[in-house]
Amino acid sequence: AMTDVLSAEDIKKAVGAFSAAESFNYKKFFEMVGLKKKSPEDVKKVFHILDKDRSGFIEEEELKFVLKGFTPDGRDLSDKETKALLAAGDKDGDGKIGADEFATMVAES
């Protein structure tokens, strides 16, 4: 579970901070949720939790539910937010985010 890696309180605060539509900012979110200061192993654990279909990638349809991955009451991202998040993370242009790309996004935040 996400709470094995991150504090439930931090998750609640971070998800709550972006409850308004079109407000999602992944850099601020990863920082607030405490992911930025976690070890590479922990960042990888979070990646695997978000990779719902265990494909080794977070696809666009999984990104839409990224906040739900942190907590069940997180909102769905809008199409615009989802596409912006994908564009920010998908460095090699394959239309999805791999574990290394995810780690880079966290490091950049």
Curated annotation (Swiss-Prot):
Limits of the EF-hand domain: 38-73, 77-109
Binding site for Ca(2+) 2: 90, 92, 94, 96, 101
GO MF, one example: calcium ion binding
Gene Ontology cellular component annotations, sorted alphabetically: cytoplasm
Modified residues (N-acetylalanine): 1
Protein residues bound to Ca(2+) 1: 51, 53, 55, 62
CDD domains: EFh_parvalbumin_alpha
Keyword annotations of the record: Acetylation, Calcium, Metal-binding, Muscle protein, Repeat
Entries under SMART domains matching the protein: EFh
Family: Belongs to the parvalbumin family.
Annotated function: In muscle, parvalbumin is thought to be involved in relaxation after contraction. It binds two calcium ions.
Additional remarks: This parvalbumin has an isoelectric point of 5.2.
Protein name per UniProt: Parvalbumin, muscle
